[in-house]
Amino acid sequence: MKNVIDPFISLSYWPSAGGFGSNTNILETNIINPSVVLSVLIYFGKGVLSNLLDNRKQKILNTIRNSEELCKGAIDQLEKARARLREVEMIGDEIRVNGDSQVEREKEDLINAASENLEQLEDPKNETIYSEQQRAIDQIRQQVSRQALRRTIGTLNSRFKIELHLRTINQNIGLFRTMMNTPD
């Protein structure tokens, strides 16, 4: 056992070499050691740092590209929707103006025709005038009802399903037949 302890005892007599530590005095330090450490850190750290920055840059660029594409798609869809809205508004305005002006024209034409007929006829022909007025009024009613029916059918065609539309038509035909068969 003595042989095992002897080497440790002899170590206690050796003078210590100073050990590791940091020397903050620049004049006492070896300038080569810190420069080597700094060079190694810069050399290896530069590659890692540049890779991290490149990856981050690519992610940012991809995000920007995706955002721009989504924005362009949304703008295109918005423009298409606006163009479609303008078309529909113009068509609606045309239908409204044409329908109203046609009804007014026909009404004015019939009133003018009735007025002319009244001017041409004299007092003894009041019955003829009355019948012509009734005919003109009936024509106006028919034309107005036709126009209203056309508009109603257009509205029904666009709003109801075909089954409901057919059921409504059949009910109206039945009502019309009963009205035609019923004497006044």
Curated annotation (Swiss-Prot):
<keyword id="KW-0067">ATP-binding</keyword>
<protein>
    <recommendedName>
        <fullName>ATP synthase subunit b, chloroplastic</fullName>
    </recommendedName>
</protein>
<keyword id="KW-0150">Chloroplast</keyword>
<keyword id="KW-0547">Nucleotide-binding</keyword>
<keyword id="KW-1133">Transmembrane helix</keyword>
<comment type="subunit">
    <text>F-type ATPases have 2 components, F(1) - the catalytic core - and F(0) - the membrane proton channel. F(1) has five subunits: alpha(3), beta(3), gamma(1), delta(1), epsilon(1). F(0) has four main subunits: a(1), b(1), b'(1) and c(10-14). The alpha and beta chains form an alternating ring which encloses part of the gamma chain. F(1) is attached to F(0) by a central stalk formed by the gamma and epsilon chains, while a peripheral stalk is formed by the delta, b and b' chains.</text>
</comment>
<comment type="function">
    <text>Component of the F(0) channel, it forms part of the peripheral stalk, linking F(1) to F(0).</text>
</comment>
<keyword id="KW-0375">Hydrogen ion transport</keyword>
<keyword id="KW-0813">Transport</keyword>
<keyword id="KW-0812">Transmembrane</keyword>
<keyword id="KW-0793">Thylakoid</keyword>
<keyword id="KW-0472">Membrane</keyword>
<keyword id="KW-0406">Ion transport</keyword>
<dbReference type="Pfam" id="PF00430">
    <property type="entry name" value="ATP-synt_B"/>
</dbReference>
<comment type="similarity">
    <text>Belongs to the ATPase B chain family.</text>
</comment>
<dbReference type="GO" id="GO:0005524">
    <property type="term" value="F:ATP binding"/>
</dbReference>
<dbReference type="GO" id="GO:0045259">
    <property type="term" value="C:proton-transporting ATP synthase complex"/>
</dbReference>
<dbReference type="GO" id="GO:0009535">
    <property type="term" value="C:chloroplast thylakoid membrane"/>
</dbReference>
<dbReference type="GO" id="GO:0046933">
    <property type="term" value="F:proton-transporting ATP synthase activity, rotational mechanism"/>
</dbReference>
<keyword id="KW-0066">ATP synthesis</keyword>
<keyword id="KW-0934">Plastid</keyword>
<comment type="function">
    <text>F(1)F(0) ATP synthase produces ATP from ADP in the presence of a proton or sodium gradient. F-type ATPases consist of two structural domains, F(1) containing the extramembraneous catalytic core and F(0) containing the membrane proton channel, linked together by a central stalk and a peripheral stalk. During catalysis, ATP synthesis in the catalytic domain of F(1) is coupled via a rotary mechanism of the central stalk subunits to proton translocation.</text>
</comment>
<feature type="transmembrane region" description="Helical">
    <location>
        <begin position="31"/>
        <end position="49"/>
    </location>
</feature>
<keyword id="KW-0138">CF(0)</keyword>
<dbReference type="InterPro" id="IPR002146">
    <property type="entry name" value="ATP_synth_b/b'su_bac/chlpt"/>
</dbReference>
